[in-house]
Amino acid sequence: MERILFMKVRLSTLCYIEKDNQYLMLHRVVKKNDVNKDKWIGVGGHFEEGESPEECVLREVKEETGYTLTSYRYRGLVTFVFADIEMEYMSLFTADGFEGEPIACNEGVLEWVDIEKVWKLNLWEGDKIFFRLLDENVPFFSLKLVYSREGKLEYAALNGKPMEMFDVIDEDGRPTGVVKERGVVHREGALHATSHVWFARPNEKSG
């Protein structure tokens, strides 16, 4: 008989609001028991009954920032799997138009951060993948991210195809226990346990 796993499924939205080449980032430092404790993320939250992704993100942004979005794009669907015990389907948005006055957020501290400096923040490894996709203006995408119980990224797939993952090493060649996607490794210049070999074909002048 086929084994059926019953997993808790959540629905959520996340939005990165852009202004003057900066993203509005939320530093999650308020709640003690927070899976995102000390991480930097975008603005968003879980669906309320009967909401569409657009209705959810508009409400969450208003509640957490005080802003009303006037121009936004639905960029992708991110599937999170946490240690085979919980799943989350997250609708990812970006916005470049808003109005209203900012308010304090009870989820953390809001801060405008230069987009190029976002990579230096304490981010989830999977978030770096969709940041790269956003930076490259990839059309609407489906991204799957699988995490261990310890919060380590173990697997990623883009539009149903597995992405290449590298084990990051330190300067002495020792494993760090961190796994990064190929594009993120190249973006950050991280050391990894692979080597690239180029073969030169002799020409007439080489003898």
Segments from the language model and where they lie:
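Short, active-site-adjacent segments that bind or coordinate small-molecule cofactors and metal centers
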Residues: 134-154
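Conserved hydrophobic "DFG−1" position in protein kinase catalytic cores
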Residues: 17, 25, 94-95, 112, ...
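Residue-level signal for well-ordered, solvent-exposed loop/turn and beta-edge residues enriched
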Residues: 22, 73, 152, 172-174, ...
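Conserved Nudix-box catalytic region and its N-terminal flanking loop in Nudix hydrolases
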Residues: 23-59, 63, 149, 153-160, ...
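Unchanged
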Residues: 47-70, 80-134, 155-163, 204
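Acidic, metal-coordinating catalytic segment for phosphate/diphosphate chemistry
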Residues: 2-14, 161-204
